[in-house]
Amino acid sequence: MGFGKIVETSPFDHDSIIAYTSQLAHVVSSAYVKSPTMQKELGFSAGSFKDMTRVATLNETMWTTLFMSNRDCLVFEIDELIKHLTEYRDAIADNNSDTLEQLLKDGRILKEEEI
């Protein structure tokens, strides 16, 4: 299948991890492409745009079933993302470059530690 190793976990931990590592990305991608700016992206987009939109091309029937069967974990992750996006939004709206830079730094460090 291409997976590097088998991991044993509880059903709840599995569902929580899948909500975060897979399902949330599909929700975010689907929501992201709904921006009215999407119609104007031609000629301006590159790798980041392609990365963000790749999984928006999905089987909506299958993913609806998967999302609904894991709704508690997925709603938790969506709420977490909204909380963090609000922090970024507020820093930008308030013209608070120090807070924004710290938020970006925190994200970079978390990603680097994960690798």
Residue ranges and their predicted role:
Residues 1-54:
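Internal alpha-helical scaffold of NAD(P)-dependent oxidoreductase catalytic cores
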Residues 23, 106, 110-113:
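Alpha-helical scaffold segments in carbohydrate-active enzymes
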Residues 28, 85, 89, 111-115:
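A structural signal for well-ordered alpha-helices, especially hydrophobic packing surfaces
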Residues 38-107:
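Interdomain hinge/lid region at the active-site interface
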